[in-house]
A protein has these predicted regions:
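Conserved FAD/dinucleotide-binding core of flavoprotein oxidoreductases
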Residues: 94, 102-119, 194-298
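Conserved mid-domain beta->alpha element of the FAD-binding
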Residues: 15-39, 165-166, 282, 297-390
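Conserved Rossmann-like nucleotide-cofactor binding loop
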Residues: 21, 44, 171
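Short aromatic-enriched loop/helix-cap "lid" or pocket-rim segments at secondary-structure transitions
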Residues: 49-52, 148, 204-207, 386-387, ...
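Short catalytic/ligand-binding loop motif for oxyanion handling, primarily in non-cytosolic enzymes
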Residues: 46-47, 160, 172-176, 202, ...
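Eukaryotic N-terminal low-complexity, Ser/Thr- and Lys/Arg-rich leader segments
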Residues: 1-12, 31, 148, 208-213, ...
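Glycine-rich active-site loop/strand segments that organize a redox cofactor
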Residues: 41-45, 49-54, 59-60, 64
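Conserved N-terminal helical subregion
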Residues: 2-13, 56-179, 183-198, 274-275
Length: 422
């Protein structure tokens, strides 16, 4: 018979990564009085800047149920435009033909209780409340004994715990340690540039005339794609900056013939070359997309990205005292905006299945059964979601595929109806 092991104060749960799933899990474990430690490779919460704007919708009930009441009440602190929400504004997420400016699709409006727009940075700041994050702790490896899990860091230190929970993102070091031959993400045939825009209220009017929070579209003439997302608004601050902060992302298909180039168009090397490339694409777009792109400041840093995903196999299974969560389990392309929603519900699925075992100090055999059930639940939900997001990414750069049946435009829901052979 397997010896009974216990989760004691000396052996906390080791959360690797202080992203949304890691911090939300920490908040819940704190409420359950289950010991934990959080390790993050970055230097602090501001290392990565504001990050993406996130739409939280079908995960909102889970988020609110996992947080203590006093933090759930503070969610508006993470809103991209608190004053707009207070006025009752809601996004329709309009989708345009960039070549003509014609509206192709939009979603029904939703109340604040059903859908919110937040920044990743703002949500992380909120979730980090009262959580002791151990910074600059990059994972180097993991190991197991019958009654413990050990996390080893690149500074030479190591920590022993009862369970390792990988919340360390799409390039998860934990996943790499567990699956050295199958940890890599799948690179999609798309390339992306992203830039921050600081806009006056007058400059924002062309965006606000179309939507309060978010614009997106594909050019029917060349399959380039753009989205513009509000990240911050003047009234969010006691001392108004009088500037809106928006994120503009421009992406294109990585294939022969795009934009009359014989070979696939690579990401330009220098910042100036990237700006000129965006300008060239913008000449083919309608307003307001054209002017917004042409007015990118010369000195504004333009970042680059290759969309990637990680689709867990149907029979995917971790082992020993380790489990994956969020992007570490199912990294998604951002074209359906569901990655954060899945990460939040991952935490709920873990709490429902594994926390009772941990709280009652049950042994590894019972814990492993609970973790297997958690993984089954996540794969059933997130595998179709990841594949739908992949298809949405590809469709966003093939105008002829964009219709009401494309995952790019279909309803966002927890259990995606996307079939694997689509």
């Amino acid at each position: 018979m397997t010896p009974r092991t216990v989760c004691s104060v000396e052996k906390p749960i080791l959360i690797i990564g202080a992203g949304i799933s890691g911090l939300l899990l920490a908040q819940r474990l704190r409420q359950e009085a289950i010991p934990f430690r959080v390790f993050e490779r970055d230097a602090d919460l501001s290392t990565r800047g504001a990050g993406w704007g996130l739409t939280l919708h079908w995960s909102l009930p889970a988020l609110r149920s996992l947080l203590p009441d006093h933090l759930a009440e503070r969610l508006p602190e993470a809103y991209v435009d608190r004053a707009a929400v207070a006025r009752g504004a809601s996004s329709c997420f309009p989708f345009f033909d960039l070549s003509t400016g014609e509206l192709k699709a939009k979603t029904p409006k939703a109340s604040e209780s059903q859908r919110i727009r937040v920044t990743r940075e703002g949500l992380r700041n909120l979730l980090a409340t009262d959580i002791n994050i151990e910074w600059e702790k990059a994972l180097a490896g993991i190991s197991f004994s019958p009654d413990s899990a050990t996390a080893e860091f690149d500074d030479g230190s190591s920590v022993i715990g009862s369970l390792i929970v990988a919340c360390d993102g799409g390039q998860s070091a934990v996943r790499r340690s567990l699956f050295p031959d199958q940890w890599e993400t799948h690179k999609l045939p798309v390339r992306m540039l992203g830039v921050k825009l600081q806009l006056s209220p007058d400059q924002m009017k062309s965006i606000h005339d179309l939507d309060t929070f978010f614009l997106q579209g594909t050019a029917s003439s060349n399959d380039s794609f753009v989205y513009i997302s509000v990240l911050d608004a003047p009234e969010n601050h006691a001392l108004s900056t009088e500037k809106y902060i928006c994120q503009m992302c421009v992406s294109w298909p990585y294939r022969d013939g795009f934009f009359n180039n014989a070979l696939p168009t690579e990401i330009p090397n220098s910042n100036e070359e990237r700006r000129r490339f965006i300008h060239a694409l913008a000449q083919t777009w309608a307003e307001p997309f054209r002017t917004l792109a042409l007015n990118i400041p010369i000195d504004e840093d333009i970042k680059h990205l290759t969309p990637q995903d990680f689709v867990p196999d149907l029979n995917f299974r971790t082992s020993d005292r380790a489990v994956l969560m969020g992007d570490a389990f199912h990294a998604m392309a951002m074209y359906r905006g569901e990655g954060a929603n899945h990460a939040i519900v991952d935490v709920l699925d873990f709490v429902d299945r594994a926390v009772p075992v941990l709280r009652d100090n049950q042994g590894i055999t019972t814990l492993r059964v609970a973790l297997d059930e958690y993984e089954d639940a996540v794969i059933k939900r997130a595998r179709p979601g990841t594949l739908a997001s992949r298809r949405a990414c590809l469709d966003a750069h093939e105008w002829h595929r964009i219709n009401g049946d494309s995952p790019l435009l279909t309803k966002r829901e927890m259990m995606s109806q996307y079939a694997e052979d689509d």
